[in-house]
């Protein structure tokens, strides 16, 4: 029984990272983008497209971008790639 748990433990630990892909993008000052209307809205969609992903929405009064990687999280990282 212990052997089975030993083999499945790394899989169980990595599941939350696969299920919750995305993050809050940061502006030029390193702060998250605020939003006024919860759920899907044009402001957050625009912000997420600037950061290189197709979909985002307002969650907890801040823009959340689905499938946003850490390399595109900061505005300046995205800006450097486009120059």
Swiss-Prot record:
Q: Extract the signal peptide range.
A: 1-21
Q: Gene3D superfamilies of this UniProt entry?
A: Knottin, scorpion toxin-like (3.30.30.10)
Subcellular location field: Secreted
A GO cellular component term found in this entry reads:
extracellular region
Tell me which InterPro entries the record gives: LCN-type_CS_alpha_beta_dom (IPR044062), Scorpion_toxin-like_sf (IPR036574), Scorpion_toxinL/defensin (IPR002061)
Indicate whether Disulfide bond appears among the record's keywords.
Answer: yes
Q: Which UniProt keywords apply?
A: Disulfide bond, G-protein coupled receptor impairing toxin, Ion channel impairing toxin, Neurotoxin, Potassium channel impairing toxin, Secreted, Signal, Toxin, Voltage-gated potassium channel impairing toxin, Voltage-gated sodium channel impairing toxin
Principal localisation: secreted
Tissue-wise expression: Expressed by the venom gland.
**Any GO molecular function:** toxin activity
Q: Which residues form the LCN-type CS-alpha/beta domain?
A: 22-83
Note the SS bond partners: 35-58, 44-63, 48-65
Q: Tell me the function of this protein.
A: The heterodimer non-edited LVP1 induces lipolysis in rat adipocytes. Induction of lipolysis by LVP1 appears to be mediated through the beta-2 adrenergic receptor pathway (ADRB2). The edited BmKBTx-like, similar to beta-toxins, may modulate voltage-gated sodium channels (Nav) and may block voltage-gated potassium channels (Kv).
Recorded domain comment: Has the structural arrangement of an alpha-helix connected to antiparallel beta-sheets by disulfide bonds (CS-alpha/beta).
- Please state which protein family the record places this protein in: Belongs to the long (3 C-C) scorpion toxin superfamily.
Q: How does it assemble?
A: Monomer (edited version) and heterodimer (non-edited version) of this alpha chain and a beta chain (AC P0CI43).
Tell me the protein's name: Lipolysis-activating peptide 1-alpha chain
Species source reads Lychas mucronatus (Chinese swimming scorpion)
